[in-house]
């Protein structure tokens, strides 16, 4: 048990020392994986299927908050779906608008949950985020997790 406490303190010191580098790298990886998975699973527009687009969007995501990244991912999905069917794009637009209103109305600090939930669903570990949020998050944190689950099933 003492070993875990020592490891925790060393991890806190490392994060405190290199916070300025760790946060943008994690945001880049989350953004890259998000846009790459959208391209791989939705990918109807050939101009956006370029492998460089997710890398550029990941770089952009490393400098903006998670909420804006989630909104850009929604717009990215809308552009792909509008290539096939404007009616379905309109339905998804209404859903993205409702998620945005709920998200910013309740708790804008939990944007990473909105991105991580569908991301981990695609990586075949679906119940990690809902379980962790249920055990350690607040009651309002359920909104981005539920929205992330709905987004996953829309993409599938």
Set out the residue ranges of the language-model regions.
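Short, Lys/Arg-rich, polar N-terminal cytosolic tail immediately upstream
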Residues: 1-17
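Generic multipass alpha-helical transmembrane bundles of integral membrane proteins
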Residues: 129-156
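Alpha-helical transmembrane segments of polytopic integral membrane proteins
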Residues: 31, 35, 113-116, 125, ...
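C-terminal halves and exits of single transmembrane alpha-helices
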Residues: 88-113
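Generic transmembrane alpha-helix motif of multi-pass integral membrane proteins
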Residues: 54-64, 72-80, 98-103, 114-120, ...
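Hydrophobic transmembrane alpha-helices
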Residues: 20-74, 81
């Amino acid at each position: 048990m003492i070993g875990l406490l020592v490891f925790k303190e060393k991890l806190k010191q490392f994060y405190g020392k290199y916070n300025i580098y760790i946060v943008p790298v994690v945001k880049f990886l989350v953004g890259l994986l998000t846009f790459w998975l959208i391209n791989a699973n939705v990918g109807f527009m050939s101009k956006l299927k370029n492998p460089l687009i997710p890398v550029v969007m990941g770089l952009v995501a490393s400098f903006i908050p998670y909420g804006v990244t989630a909104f850009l991912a929604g717009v990215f999905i809308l552009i792909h779906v509008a290539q096939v069917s404007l009616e379905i794009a309109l339905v998804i637009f209404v859903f993205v608008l409702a998620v945005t209103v709920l998200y910013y109305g309740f708790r804008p600090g939990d944007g990473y949950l909105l991105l991580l939930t569908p991301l981990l669903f695609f990586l075949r570990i679906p119940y990690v985020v809902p379980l962790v949020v249920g055990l350690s998050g607040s009651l309002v944190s359920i909104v981005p997790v539920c929205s992330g689950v709905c987004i996953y099933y829309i993409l599938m």
